[in-house]
């Protein structure tokens, strides 16, 4: 019994001792300092409550996250990513939800003259059954001596088909189908003169049409002119560029000229013959007044005769002829042009207005000016990262109009 009592007393003393008044003495030379203190009990629930009160609400933390997302941190971080998600829409894919990771980085963080490299990872799913994932980017090596531009993506898209040529897109009834598309493309460039590059391009693409809406009537075969519903092609080519743009995704000044010749060998696909494609781009950017950029774009693509339907030039996408259903007007060749005024309005918010035109045709000797289609529209911009914009455009065309939500400037 005495032992139990001693143990209980010892336990009580050990628990109560921290809360009892304690005396300490410090001696310094001939002086002695005596003091007595009593530790106060700590209320753990109050401390936790204060911590919870100091924690910002989710919405405020989200605002803080995006407030700093447009600051250039490429000199202090290996790669500076910003993540975003929200609704997406285009005339081709309808309403959906998109996720995006936009990153900026520098391979040489001691080089403050060269523009940073960029990469975008994206995923999208829509109520119409679209799903797509991919990555695209531009890697700029030290002192901009070399460049690597790349795109890797897969998409499954319910689409409409009108056939080939201006008259088909204008007057035919659409046939619905699902298009599965795989694309891998890389363009490696080497600087040979100031702002002048030459390089090679390598691409692989596979497209398959499935679930045609009129399979019983087989009228879609008329639109395909007897071609197969699936094609695979591997492209090899040469690129020559002149590029004085200050930043590829969103230039404020400079000129960009690109000429590319690509061949698709018969033995590296199932197209049945060797094909070729010629592409030309000419872009110019000039500041016209404070925070306002005037941008111009000329684009042309020419495919060889007998190019399969999935590889034809398709008018209307998130870069050119915005507002048209992509592929309603399709043919061997296409020429488009547009001029856009880009104005920063307040802090990270801006707006745009543009106008342009486009034409699809089978060959230059069959080009018809009366088949030229108009295009114009306006847009809203929000700076997600330093000079990387999220854009909402509304484009108008001939008997058509549509919203478009995307990332980076159209050109």
Residue ranges and their predicted role:
Residues 73-82, 89-228, 232, 389, ...:
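Gram-negative/organellar outer-membrane beta-barrel architecture
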Residues 303-391:
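Outer membrane beta-barrel transmembrane domains
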Residues 1-27:
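Bacterial Sec-dependent N-terminal signal peptides
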Residues 80-89, 114-127, 133, 255-267, ...:
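Transmembrane beta-strand segments that form the barrel wall of outer-membrane beta-barrel proteins
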């Amino acid at each position: 019994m005495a032992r139990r009592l001693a143990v209980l007393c010892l336990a009580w003393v050990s628990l109560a001792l921290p809360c009892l008044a304690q005396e300490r003495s410090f001696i310094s030379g001939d002086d002695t300092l005596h003091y007595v203190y009593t530790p106060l009990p700590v209320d753990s629930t109050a401390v936790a409550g204060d911590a919870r009160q100091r924690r910002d609400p989710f919405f405020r933390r989200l605002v803080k996250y995006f407030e700093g997302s447009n600051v250039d941190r490429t000199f202090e971080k290996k790669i500076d990513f910003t993540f975003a998600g929200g609704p997406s829409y285009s005339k081709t894919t309808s309403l959906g939800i998109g996720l995006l990771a936009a990153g900026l980085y520098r391979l040489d963080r001691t080089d403050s003259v060269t523009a940073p490299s960029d990469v975008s990872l994206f995923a999208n799913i829509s109520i119409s059954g679209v799903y797509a994932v991919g990555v695209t980017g531009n890697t700029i090596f030290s002192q901009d001596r070399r460049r690597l531009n790349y795109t890797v993506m897969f998409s499954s898209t319910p689409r409409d088909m009108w056939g080939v040529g201006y008259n088909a897109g204008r007057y035919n009834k659409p046939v619905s189908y699902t298009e599965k598309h795989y694309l891998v493309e890389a363009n490696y460039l080497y600087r040979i003169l100031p702002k002048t590059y030459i390089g090679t391009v390598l691409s692989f693409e596979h497209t398959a049409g499935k679930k045609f809406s009129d399979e019983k009537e087989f009228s879609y075969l008329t639109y395909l002119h007897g071609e197969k519903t699936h094609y695979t092609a591997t492209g090899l080519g040469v690129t020559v560029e002149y590029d004085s743009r200050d930043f590829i995704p969103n230039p404020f000044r400079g000129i960009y000229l690109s000429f590319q010749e690509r061949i698709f060998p018969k033995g590296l696909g199932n197209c049945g013959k060797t094909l070729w494609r010629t592409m030309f781009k000419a872009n110019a950017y000039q500041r016209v007044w404070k925070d306002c950029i005037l941008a111009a774009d000329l684009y042309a693509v020419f495919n060889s005769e007998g190019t399969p339907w999935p590889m034809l030039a398709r008018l209307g996408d998130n870069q050119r002829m915005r507002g048209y259903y992509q592929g309603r007007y399709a043919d061997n060749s296409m020429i488009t042009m547009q001029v856009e005024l880009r104005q920063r309005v307040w802090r990270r918010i801006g707006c745009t207005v543009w106008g342009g035109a486009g034409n699809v045709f089978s060959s230059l000797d069959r080009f018809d000016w009366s088949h030229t289609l108009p295009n114009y529209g306006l847009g809203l911009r929000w700076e997600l990262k330093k000079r990387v914009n999220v854009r909402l455009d509304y484009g108008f065309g001939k008997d058509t109009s549509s919203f478009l939500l995307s990332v980076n400037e159209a050109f």
